[in-house]
Amino acid sequence: MLQGHERSITQIKYNREGDLLFSCSKDQKPNVWYSLNGERLGTYDGHQGAVWCLDVDWETRKLITGAGDMTTKIWDVEYGTVIASIAAKSSVRTCNFSFSGNQAAYSTDKAMGQNCELFIIDVRNADSSLSEQAPTLRIPMVESKITSMLWGPLDETIITGHDNGNIAIWDIRKGQKVVDSGSDHTAGINDMQLSKDGTMFVTASKDTTAKLFDSESLMCLKTYKTERPVNSAAISPILDHVVLGGGQDAMEVTTTSTKAGKFDSRFFHLIYEEEFARLKGHFGPINSLAFHPDGKSYASGGEDGFVRVQTFDSTYFENIFE
């Protein structure tokens, strides 16, 4: 159990090797932890508002964060210093490095008279001058705001999940939408996470389901049904398993006993769509989930401000569907 945030966790992410776990919360300070023993290595101090999103690049050199103080910041992971701070006109809701680490994308909220927009910036030679440079691409979102985002294969596309349940793929060379999912989800998308090989991704939605989609055609492959909104979902890198986390909206939560089972991590079989396990722990909804890159443990971040890292025992790796 990692205790270091004063307010609810908004997102957690492992780096590629899995030795570091990054977490951000509404208390303005993203943290980095040793995933093996839960030791806090440091804090990235500089935001003036709730930090909504973060991502770490392939080489664990740069960290990008987006916050309610209307800035996106790029940090030096090792030294904790701000490399660049980019101002936006509303809260920054999502941010992601591309696989190559040459580009980063972030999106802003529809608020204060501003439309939601998707920005792509070049971060190859990131320094303080980045805040003055124009983004390499800027796409206004007219219909519905972006609530989650992924880079597609070969850094050629961006997949966006929206507040109205829609999913779209954008070609960043043309700057236009190339695929639209239609209305597979009937409510907002809270989270999207790719499979290890990038061919599929799982969505978590307020419509109480998580769905598995093809990364290129946006065809819905599988549906995992629950009784309450799903805040986060992740795909195991080694087994055909999906973990879902959620609960009620934060504002609807009363002090419920954990026995009610509302705030469990729920494991589903990727192919058979069957739930086979639940893990308790959080005293509130789970806001973010991440599998360790080796698939032997996973982490969850909750509305209670804690990050829990849980290691699987040997029985988890036995095929229970034989």
Curated annotation (Swiss-Prot):
Localization, UniProt: Cytoplasm
Superkingdom assignment: Eukaryota
SMART domains: WD40 (SM00320)
Gene Ontology process terms (BP): formation of cytoplasmic translation initiation complex
GO cellular component: eukaryotic 43S preinitiation complex; eukaryotic 48S preinitiation complex; eukaryotic translation initiation factor 3 complex, eIF3m
GO MF entries: RNA binding; translation initiation factor activity
Main location: cytoplasm
InterPro entries with a match to the protein in the record: eIF3i, WD40/YVTN_repeat-like_dom_sf, WD40_repeat_CS, WD40_repeat_dom_sf, WD40_rpt
Pfam families: EIF3I
WD repeats: 4-43, 46-85, 141-180, 184-223, 281-322
Keywords: Cytoplasm, Initiation factor, Protein biosynthesis, Repeat, WD repeat
Similarity comment: Belongs to the eIF-3 subunit I family.
Summary of subunit composition and partner proteins: Component of the eukaryotic translation initiation factor 3 (eIF-3) complex. The eIF-3 complex interacts with pix.
Functional summary from the UniProt entry: Component of the eukaryotic translation initiation factor 3 (eIF-3) complex, which is involved in protein synthesis of a specialized repertoire of mRNAs and, together with other initiation factors, stimulates binding of mRNA and methionyl-tRNAi to the 40S ribosome. The eIF-3 complex specifically targets and initiates translation of a subset of mRNAs involved in cell proliferation.
Protein name: Eukaryotic translation initiation factor 3 subunit I
Protein species of origin: Drosophila mojavensis (Fruit fly)
Gene name as annotated: eIF3i
